[in-house]
Swiss-Prot record:
GO terms for cellular component: cell projection; late endosome; late endosome membrane; lysosomal membrane; lysosome; membrane; phagocytic cup; phagocytic vesicle membrane. InterPro entries: MCLN_ECD, ML1_ELD, Mucolipin, PKD1_2_channel. A motif (Dileucine internalization motif) lies at residues 573-578. It comes from Macaca fascicularis (Crab-eating macaque). Belongs to the transient receptor (TC 1.A.4) family. Polycystin subfamily. MCOLN1 sub-subfamily. Pfam families: MCLN_ECD (PF21381), PKD_channel (PF08016). Residues 1-38 are annotated as: Disordered. The gene is MCOLN1. It is found in: Late endosome membrane; Lysosome membrane; Cytoplasmic vesicle membrane; Cell projection, Phagocytic cup. This is Mucolipin-1.
Length: 580
C-alpha cells in the first residue's frame, strides 16, 4: 500500500517551493492572490497588444488611427495621381526635346542609333561638326519648336558667346606605328572657338558679308587627329513647355544645356558621336494665360494632405512612445519583483513595426508635398526627387493597410508566412549572394570584352538575374555563339559558365528557396498559432483572463465593432494574430 505520508510530503514540498509560473496552479489548494499592482500591469499589457476591434470592446475607444489611415490613403493616392500627370508631361517634354535636338544637330541621325552613331573618316567628322554649328545658327528657321539663344552658354569656354566649339588634345604627341614608337605628353590642352548666334530680326542684305565673316570663323577649324582626345560643342537654348496648360497649370520655362561630344579617346579609327542635354526649369517672367483657372484648389488639397499626415504622425509617434514607456515599466517591475532581466527580443515586442512604417511614410509625404508646393509655385524644379518621395510614401501607406487585414484570420497567411520564413530566407540569401557575386565578377572580367550584356558589373548582375527567371536565355547564348570565331577558348568558357550558372540557380537555388517558403506555409497551417512559439511576454500576458467585454479595462461601450475589424474572434487566436 502507498504510504499516506508520501503524497502529503510531496504536496507540502510543492507548495513551499517557489513557483515562477504565471498564475496557473495545479492541485486542490487555491493559488495565492495576484498583487493588484501586477494584475494592473498585466491588464495594461494586454490592452496595449489588443487589436483596434478589441480596444473598442474594452473601452469603447473608436479606431481613430484606422479611420485616419483610410482617409490618408485616399488623399495621398489622389495627390500622387495629380502629381504623376504633371511629372509625366515634364519628363515627356524633356525627352522629346532631346530627340529633336539629336535629329537637328547630328548629321544622318536615326532613332535607336545612339550606340552605333559614329564617324569613320576625317571628312565625315568635319561634316558632322560643321553641320551641328550650321544648324545652331539657322535654328529659328529650321526648327519646329520655339527656341531662343542664350549668350554665355553656361560654359567657361564660351567666353560670353552663344556656342563653344572646343577640341582637346595632348600637349605633345607623336605616334609612329611603322617603327612601333610614340612620344606622348599626357597633359591635355583645350582650344575653343566662340560662335555667336545671328541677331534677330535678320540683317539687311548690305550686312550679309559682315554676318558671314563673323559667324563662319569655325570653318577654319583644324583638328590635330594624331593627338586628338575629343571635340565638344556646347550651347544653351531656352523654350517654354505649354503642355502644362492641359492640367490647368502655369507653363514652365526651360533652359536646355546641350553638349555634343565627338569622342576619340580610344584612337581606334572610330569616333562615337553623342548628344546629351540637361534641363533647368525656372519660373517664367510675367506669365499671362487667358482664362486660366484658379490653382488654389491644388494648394488647399496639399495643405489637407500635410495636416492629415501630421495628425497621423502624432498619433503613431504617441503610440510608439507609450510602448516605450510601458516597456520600461515592465522591465523595472520584473526586476524589482522577480529579479528577472528582460531580453532584447522581448523588449522589441513593444516596438510596433507598423507604426514605424506609418511614421516613415508620413515624413516622406510631408516632405514631398512641401516640395510639390514649391514646384507648382515655380520656386523648385526637383521633379525627380519629389516623385521619389511621394511614390515611396504611397507605397508604404498601402503596405500599412496589411496590418489591418491581418486581424482577419484568413488574411493573415501572407504576413504569418513571411514572419516564419524570413530568418531562414535571410540566412539562405547570404550564402547565395556569395556565389552570385562570384559569378558576376567572373563574367564581367572574362566575357565583358566579348558580350554586350557583360560590359559592366551592373549589366552582368541584371543579365544573370534575368537568366534565373528564364528571360533572354537564347539571346545570351546566341550572342556568345557569334564570338566563337574570335576566341574559341572564351566561347568554351562561356558555355561552361552559362550552363553551370543556369543549372545551379534554377534547379537548386530556386528550388530550395521555394522549399523554404513552402515549409513556412506548412508550419503555420498546424493548429496553435502562426507557426512561432509563444514568447514569455505573451505567456505572461495570457494569464490575464479578463475578456475585452469584461468591463475591467475601464468600462466602455459594448456595441458591435466596426466592419473593418474582426468580429467574433476565437480567444485562442487572439494572440496568434497579433502583428507587432
Amino acid at each position: 500500500m502507498t504510504d499516506p505520508a508520501g503524497p502529503r510530503g510531496s504536496e507540502t514540498e510543492r507548495l513551499l517551493t517557489p513557483n515562477p509560473g504565471y498564475g496557473t496552479q495545479v492541485g486542490p489548494s487555491p493559488a495565492p492572490p495576484t498583487p493588484p499592482e501586477e494584475e494592473d500591469l498585466r491588464r495594461r499589457l494586454k490592452y496595449f497588444f489588443m487589436s483596434p476591434c478589441d480596444k473598442f470592446r474594452a473601452k469603447g475607444r473608436k479606431p481613430c488611427k484606422l479611420m485616419l489611415q483610410v482617409v490618408k490613403i485616399l488623399v495621398v493616392t489622389v495627390q500622387l495621381i495629380l502629381f504623376g500627370l504633371s511629372n509625366q508631361l515634364a519628363v515627356t517634354f524633356r525627352e522629346e526635346n532631346t530627340i529633336a535636338f539629336r535629329h537637328l544637330f547630328l548629321l544622318g541621325y536615326s532613332d535607336g542609333a545612339d550606340d552605333t552613331f559614329a564617324a569613320y573618316t576625317q571628312e565625315q567628322l568635319y561634316q558632322a561638326i560643321f553641320h551641328a554649328v550650321d544648324q545652331y545658327l539657322a535654328l529659328p528657321d529650321v526648327s519646329l519648336g520655339r527656341y531662343a539663344y542664350v549668350h554665355g552658354g553656361g560654359d567657361p569656354w564660351t567666353n560670353g558667346s552663344g556656342l563653344a566649339l572646343c577640341q582637346r588634345y595632348y600637349h605633345r604627341g607623336h605616334v609612329d606605328p611603322a617603327n612601333d614608337t610614340f612620344d606622348i605628353d599626357p597633359m591635355v590642352v583645350t582650344d575653343c572657338i566662340q560662335v555667336d548666334p545671328p541677331e534677330r530680326p535678320p540683317p539687311s542684305p548690305s550686312d550679309d558679308l559682315a554676318l558671314l565673316e563673323g559667324s563662319s570663323s569655325y570653318k577654319n577649324l583644324t583638328l590635330k587627329f594624331h593627338k586628338l582626345v575629343n571635340v565638344t560643342i556646347h550651347f544653351r537654348l531656352k523654350t517654354i513647355n505649354l503642355q502644362s496648360l492641359i492640367n490647368n497649370e502655369i507653363p514652365d520655362c526651360y533652359t536646355f544645356s546641350v553638349l555634343i561630344t565627338f569622342d576619340n579617346k580610344a584612337h581606334s579609327g572610330r569616333i562615337p558621336i553623342s548628344l546629351e542635354t540637361q534641363a533647368h526649369i525656372q519660373e517664367c517672367k510675367h506669365p499671362s494665360v487667358f482664362r486660366h483657372g484658379d490653382n488654389s484648389f491644388r494648394l488647399l488639397f496639399d495643405v489637407v494632405v500635410i495636416l492629415t499626415c501630421s495628425l497621423s504622425f502624432l498619433l503613431c509617434a504617441r503610440s510608439l512612445l507609450r510602448g516605450f514607456l510601458l516597456q520600461n515599466e515592465f522591465v523595472r517591475f520584473m526586476w524589482r519583483q522577480r529579479r528577472r532581466v528582460i531580453s532584447l527580443w522581448e523588449r522589441l515586442e513593444f516596438v510596433n513595426g507598423w507604426y514605424i512604417l506609418l511614421v516613415t511614410s508620413d515624413v516622406l509625404t510631408i516632405s514631398g508635398t512641401i516640395m510639390k508646393i514649391g514646384i507648382e509655385a515655380k520656386n523648385l524644379a526637383s521633379y525627380d526627387v519629389c516623385s521619389i518621395l511621394l511614390g515611396t510614401s504611397t507605397l508604404l501607406v498601402w503596405v500599412g493597410v496589411i496590418r489591418y487585414l491581418t486581424f482577419f484570420h484568413n488574411y493573415n497567411i501572407l504576413i504569418a508566412t513571411l514572419r516564419v520564413a524570413l530568418p531562414s530566407v535571410m540566412r539562405f540569401c547570404c550564402c547565395v549572394a556569395v556565389i552570385y557575386l562570384g559569378y558576376c565578377f567572373c563574367g564581367w572580367i572574362v566575357l565583358g570584352p566579348y558580350h554586350v550584356k557583360f560590359r559592366s558589373l551592373s549589366m552582368v548582375s541584371e543579365c544573370l538575374f534575368s537568366l534565373i527567371n528564364g528571360d533572354d536565355m537564347f539571346v545570351t547564348f546566341a550572342a556568345m555563339q557569334a564570338q566563337q570565331g574570335r576566341s574559341s577558348l572564351v566561347w568554351l568558357f562561356s558555355q561552361l559558365y552559362l550552363y553551370s550558372f543556369i543549372s545551379l540557380f534554377i534547379y537548386m537555388v530556386l528550388s530550395l528557396f521555394i522549399a523554404l517558403i513552402t515549409g513556412a506555409y506548412d508550419t503555420i497551417k498546424h493548429p496553435g498559432g502562426a507557426g512561432a512559439e509563444e514568447s514569455e511576454l505573451q505567456a505572461y500576458i495570457a494569464q490575464c483572463q479578463d475578456s475585452p467585454t469584461s468591463g475591467k479595462f475601464r468600462r466602455g461601450s459594448g456595441s458591435a465593432c466596426s466592419l473593418l475589424c474582426c468580429c467574433g474572434r476565437d480567444p485562442s487566436e487572439e494572440h496568434s494574430l497579433l502583428v507587432n
